């Protein structure tokens, strides 16, 4: 058992955070002048990066911790990207990669102190990269001051265990 699993068991956090594998692809197209980010309701997005480069993401496979990309994942991304922006079909693939994102029930992260000097900051799922600057600043202030930011009061490890009703 790895240290992560021991900590999760010791602090009763097993059900809190699971991994969701996401695959992305970076394309280059010198003839496309797309400047706006496109988000689709199925989870696919197209993000213009450096001039003529476009990040296409992301697949979501729950409880999948495998390494690398799959043909199925790449096909899904390209099919949806091409449907929205047909000019992307003429692009060159620069890079493909995958990673595992921490997911929590209701997509609500955990940001809590679980023991003296031990904090859990996880579960930001698809928004982690976007929120990391402000979360990092807030957590640094919390560690230095010893005062948890009040806006994080709902993000406890015990939520769902107390004071909540489910229908």
Residue ranges and their predicted role:
Residues 4-116:
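Active-site substrate-recognition segment that forms the wall
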Residues 87, 91-167:
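C-terminal catalytic lobe of FAD-dependent flavoproteins
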């Amino acid at each position: 058992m790895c240290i992560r699993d021991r900590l999760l068991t010791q602090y009763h956090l097993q059900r809190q955070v699971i991994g969701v594998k996401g695959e992305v692809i970076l394309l280059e197209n010198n003839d496309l002048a797309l400047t706006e980010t496109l988000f689709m309701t199925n989870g696919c997005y197209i993000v213009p990066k450096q001039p003529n480069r476009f990040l296409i993401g992301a697949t979501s496979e729950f409880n999948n911790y495998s390494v690398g990309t799959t043909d199925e994942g790449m096909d899904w991304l390209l099919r949806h990207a091409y449907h929205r922006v047909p000019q992307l079909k003429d692009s060159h693939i620069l890079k493909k990669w995958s990673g595992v994102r921490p997911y929590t029930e209701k997509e609500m992260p955990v940001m809590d102190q679980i023991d003296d000097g031990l904090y859990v900051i996880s579960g930001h799922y698809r928004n982690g990269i976007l929120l990391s600057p402000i979360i990092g600043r807030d957590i640094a202030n919390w560690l230095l001051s010893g005062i948890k930011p009040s806006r994080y009061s709902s993000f406890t490890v015990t939520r769902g265990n107390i004071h909540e009703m489910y229908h």
